[in-house]
């Protein structure tokens, strides 16, 4: 395995499959992670996953990614999307490109969910496509970090 991609899941995503399945779907976080790991393995990419309900732990994991040589971060910051300058600063501080993912369409929900502290710095934002959004983000990430085929 060559390059590394880190997938970060924010607060309450450990409750996937139980919490508001009509909004977030029926897959568990473990289901999603296993699908992503298998998808990355097919491309000979190392994929690490991390979930925390604690903002500081997520910031620490972002900092750690820089020392590990992570090439790209896929992050679902969950509720921290709308509140965390610390996450924004951590992502900018490590200068690792990132894709922001949301299971639900945050723009079709409550007004307070419409603003993201990360979107303007992300290389892309995917929302409203459920767990497939992670898969689409990973497809793009793999394409972005793998060397071009010279043929």
Swiss-Prot record:
<dbReference type="GO" id="GO:0003855">
    <property type="term" value="F:3-dehydroquinate dehydratase activity"/>
</dbReference>
<comment type="similarity">
    <text>Belongs to the type-II 3-dehydroquinase family.</text>
</comment>
<feature type="active site" description="Proton acceptor">
    <location>
        <position position="24"/>
    </location>
</feature>
<feature type="binding site">
    <location>
        <position position="113"/>
    </location>
    <ligand>
        <name>substrate</name>
    </ligand>
</feature>
<keyword id="KW-0028">Amino-acid biosynthesis</keyword>
<feature type="binding site">
    <location>
        <begin position="103"/>
        <end position="104"/>
    </location>
    <ligand>
        <name>substrate</name>
    </ligand>
</feature>
<dbReference type="GO" id="GO:0009423">
    <property type="term" value="P:chorismate biosynthetic process"/>
</dbReference>
<keyword id="KW-0057">Aromatic amino acid biosynthesis</keyword>
<dbReference type="InterPro" id="IPR018509">
    <property type="entry name" value="DHquinase_II_CS"/>
</dbReference>
<feature type="binding site">
    <location>
        <position position="76"/>
    </location>
    <ligand>
        <name>substrate</name>
    </ligand>
</feature>
<comment type="pathway">
    <text>Metabolic intermediate biosynthesis; chorismate biosynthesis; chorismate from D-erythrose 4-phosphate and phosphoenolpyruvate: step 3/7.</text>
</comment>
<keyword id="KW-0456">Lyase</keyword>
<comment type="subunit">
    <text>Homododecamer.</text>
</comment>
<dbReference type="Pfam" id="PF01220">
    <property type="entry name" value="DHquinase_II"/>
</dbReference>
<dbReference type="GO" id="GO:0008652">
    <property type="term" value="P:amino acid biosynthetic process"/>
</dbReference>
<dbReference type="InterPro" id="IPR036441">
    <property type="entry name" value="DHquinase_II_sf"/>
</dbReference>
<dbReference type="GO" id="GO:0019631">
    <property type="term" value="P:quinate catabolic process"/>
</dbReference>
<feature type="site" description="Transition state stabilizer">
    <location>
        <position position="19"/>
    </location>
</feature>
<dbReference type="InterPro" id="IPR001874">
    <property type="entry name" value="DHquinase_II"/>
</dbReference>
<protein>
    <recommendedName>
        <fullName>3-dehydroquinate dehydratase</fullName>
        <ecNumber>4.2.1.10</ecNumber>
    </recommendedName>
</protein>
<dbReference type="GO" id="GO:0009073">
    <property type="term" value="P:aromatic amino acid family biosynthetic process"/>
</dbReference>
<feature type="active site" description="Proton donor">
    <location>
        <position position="102"/>
    </location>
</feature>
<feature type="binding site">
    <location>
        <position position="82"/>
    </location>
    <ligand>
        <name>substrate</name>
    </ligand>
</feature>
<comment type="function">
    <text>Catalyzes a trans-dehydration via an enolate intermediate.</text>
</comment>
<feature type="binding site">
    <location>
        <position position="89"/>
    </location>
    <ligand>
        <name>substrate</name>
    </ligand>
</feature>
């Amino acid at each position: 395995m060559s390059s590394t991609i880190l997938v970060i899941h924010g607060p309450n995503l450990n409750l996937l499959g139980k919490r508001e399945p009509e909004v977030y779907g029926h897959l568990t976080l473990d289901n999603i992670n296993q699908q992503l790991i298998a998808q990355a393995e097919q491309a000979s990419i190392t994929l690490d996953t991390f979930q925390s309900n604690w903002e500081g732990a997520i910031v620490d994991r972002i900092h750690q990614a820089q020392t590990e040589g992570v090439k790209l971060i896929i992050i679902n910051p969950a509720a921290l999307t709308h509140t965390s300058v610390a996450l924004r600063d951590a992502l900018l501080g490590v200068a690792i490109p990132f894709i922001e993912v949301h299971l639900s369409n945050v723009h079709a929900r409550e007004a307070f969910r419409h603003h993201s502290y990360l979107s303007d710095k992300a290389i892309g934002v995917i929302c409203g496509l459920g767990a497939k959004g992670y898969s689409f983000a990973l497809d793009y990430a793999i394409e972005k970090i793998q060397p071009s085929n010279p043929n």
